[in-house]
């Protein structure tokens, strides 16, 4: 009996449940936790056209940053061009004044032939500046120089220049003529030396009236002498 029991005990010990072996844990790491960090790299695909456009824009920005404008040089160039245009305009007006002088000289030889003007006669000049008509009285040299200056500096328009018997009388006659034709739409300044038109469209009509009056009066003065 004892041998049988001994065998049974031995066989039961062989089929006993297996116990897991506990691993030794260090004293300082009883409550420590182990974390596993997983990094994920996401690669985005950028279209090629976008990259090219971006490079072009960056290149333009860089070029603009490196561009420095010399405004003084630009201003100097514009001043030179403006000065050149002013010189051309001055030469043009001088040529016009010279041609007018030659034309009037030729007219004097044909119209006033064998007629000697009295010594007290002075030259009477008329010029248009925008919406204003100016009159000038003096010797021939002074009047022609003043007309040339106005035409050159103020882009004025030559209207009339001729020797007259009484320039002050002509001024008063022109003031009466323009006032009768245009009324309050024309303003008389400086003892009838200057006539300003309120309506710029009427200055052409006023200029024609002045020329006609002065030409008619010139012929009558010549006939009187």
From Swiss-Prot:
InterPro entries: Baculovirus_E26. Palmitoylated. GO terms for cellular component: host cell cytoplasm; host cell nuclear inner membrane; membrane; virion component. Transmembrane segments: none annotated. Keywords: Early protein, Host cytoplasm, Host membrane, Host nucleus, Lipoprotein, Membrane, Palmitate, Virion. Its main location: host cell. It is found in: Host nucleus inner membrane; Virion; Host cytoplasm; Host nucleus. It comes from the Viruses. The keyword Lipid biosynthesis does not apply. Pfam families: Viral_env_E26. Interacts with proteins IE0 and IE1. Interacts with protein FP25K. Interacts with host importin alpha-16. Plays a role in the sorting of ODV envelope proteins to the host inner nuclear membrane. May facilitate the fusion and release of nucleocapsids into the cytoplasm. Modulates the expression levels of IE0 and IE1. This is Protein E26. The gene is DA26.
């Amino acid at each position: 009996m004892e041998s049988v029991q001994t065998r049974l005990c031995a066989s039961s010990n062989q089929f006993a449940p297996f116990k897991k072996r506990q691993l030794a844990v260090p004293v300082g790491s009883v409550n420590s936790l182990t974390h596993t960090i997983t990094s994920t790299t996401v690669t985005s695909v950028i279209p090629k056209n976008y990259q090219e456009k971006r490079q072009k824009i960056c290149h333009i920005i860089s070029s603009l940053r490196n561009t420095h404008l010399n405004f003084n040089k630009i201003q100097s160039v514009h001043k030179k061009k403006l000065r050149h245009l002013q010189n051309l305009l001055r030469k043009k007006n001088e040529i016009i004044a010279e041609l007018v002088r030659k034309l009037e000289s030729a007219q004097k030889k044909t119209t006033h032939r064998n007629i000697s003007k009295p010594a007290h006669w002075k030259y009477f000049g008329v010029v248009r500046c925008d919406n204003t008509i100016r009159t000038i009285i003096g010797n021939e040299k002074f009047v022609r120089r003043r007309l040339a200056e106005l035409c050159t500096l103020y882009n004025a328009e030559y209207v009339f220049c001729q020797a007259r018997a009484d320039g002050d009388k002509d001024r008063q006659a022109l003031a009466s003529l323009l006032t009768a034709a245009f009324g309050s739409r024309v303003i008389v300044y400086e003892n009838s030396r200057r006539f300003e038109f309120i309506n710029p469209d009427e200055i052409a009509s006023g200029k024609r009236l002045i020329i006609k009056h002065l030409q008619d009066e010139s012929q009558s003065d010549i006939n009187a002498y």
